[in-house]
Amino acid sequence: VTGQAIESASLAGFEQRARTFSIVPITIILFFAGTVAAALANVRRPDVHMRLMVVASVSLLTPAVARLVFLVLAGEGAPRPGMGAEPPPIAFSLLPSFLGNLVLVAAMVHDWRARGRPHRVYVIAGAALVAVQVLRVPLGATAAWHAVTMWLAK
């Protein structure tokens, strides 16, 4: 699907920005898969499994939150990114990512109140999630990432 989106955007004249922005959905998928795999490996440890599944779920919120943010900022009649309109700058992904992370913050606050501190899974996996969200901004514009997208689009 990402390869099709890149090709569609390139036909509309937005190839570079589409290639750069494609790091967002791909890192979301990879982080989700890795977190779910870790959760499945810890199924016999319910406290770890549950929290990894929460972090995995939070990692998927970015696209939904981005649609709401775009609707608020651009209005209802504006053309949607990825549907013939220019893809947004990659830095735009930070706002919906961090807004989605508020669900994780709420879970950490719940742990803090119930256990006296947040569970280490929330701290470690949450920090990894934020690192991925922040690092994809500079990495998306690199020649190495664009080479990956060329391979994906084939």
Where are these regions (language model features)?
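Alpha-helical membrane insertion/targeting regions
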Residues: 1-154
